[in-house]
Amino acid sequence: MLQYQIDRIEHQIADDRSQTGVFLIGPLERGQATTLGNSLRRVLMGNLEGTAVTAVRIAGVNHEYATIPGVREDVLDILLNCKQITVNSRTSELEIGRLVVAGPATVKARDLQFSSQVQVVDGERAIATVGEGYSLELEVHVERGIGYRPVDRHNEDTSAIDLLQIDAVFMPVHRVNFTIDETAVAEGGSARERLRMEVVTDGSITPDDAIAQAANQLIELFQPLATVTMVEEVSAEPEPTAEAQIPLEELNLSVRAYNCLKRAQVNSVSDLMGFSYEDLLEIKNFGSKSADEVIEALERIGIQIPQSRTSA
């Protein structure tokens, strides 16, 4: 199998602390770059765990359409600003950050006081502007999760009247782009490919770590396929037809034929279906006349039995 390597050729950190990494992966066989690019992109964009603000509580506010005395932004603006805060929690438990700021002041994400388990990535993110003589007291709830989680207003755990819920976007990767370049032709004339991948994160995770996590998830996904064990499918016994379940008595056979069959442990049509014409003649005291009688009775209900064992 062709050995390839991955090189990070570019790494940038923007003013909002988002990070961009550009990677070159190769050389690859034809078609492998598309396979890698699509697989990594899907996992990077939708399956990595991240942290998001899920709810906000503001002192004196019990609905999102309110205004706060002395605060320039209305509650909806504050909720939107809080939603855009980038945080990184190292615990799966709910974490709460709190702040109390007296004006005049511009309240920023760095003013939030969390436990040591939570890091505020973009501390300069503005939350609100408080005028002189006024103050703002609020708390934000942050959680870890995957993907997107809409507000659940019917959840009793989060339905407190003063707890303003937010649609949570846990995805730490904002954008993934990739292109495929052909490299020099190898010995034997087989062309090679190189995958160029750009990964942009929110800053709570580096592009390098994002690539590594995505790769590990794909390994875990495919690993069971390497140890597939074949299990023979047990064929189900065919369900007996309605005709096969007809009892021997309903064939209206002669007393002689009926008694001979009963002594041979034949109790229903399904038992007869295991016989050929030759088998019937071998039943004790069962002559050709009785055998013909059975054949005619079976034909009346649409069932035929073979003449000999070899034709069965």
UniProtKB/Swiss-Prot annotation:
InterPro entries linked: DNA-dir_RNA_pol_insert, DNA-dir_RNA_pol_RpoA/D/Rpb3, DNA-dir_RpoA, RBP11-like, RNAP_asu_C, RNApol_insert_sf
SUPFAM superfamilies from the UniProt entry: C-terminal domain of RNA polymerase alpha subunit, Insert subdomain of RNA polymerase alpha subunit, RBP11-like subunits of RNA polymerase
Entry keyword Flavoprotein: no
GO cellular component: cytoplasm; DNA-directed RNA polymerase complex
Pfam families xrefs: RNA_pol_A_bac (PF01000), RNA_pol_A_CTD (PF03118), RNA_pol_L (PF01193)
Function: DNA-dependent RNA polymerase catalyzes the transcription of DNA into RNA using the four ribonucleoside triphosphates as substrates.
Domain remarks: The N-terminal domain is essential for RNAP assembly and basal transcription, whereas the C-terminal domain is involved in interaction with transcriptional regulators and with upstream promoter elements.
Name this polypeptide is given: DNA-directed RNA polymerase subunit alpha
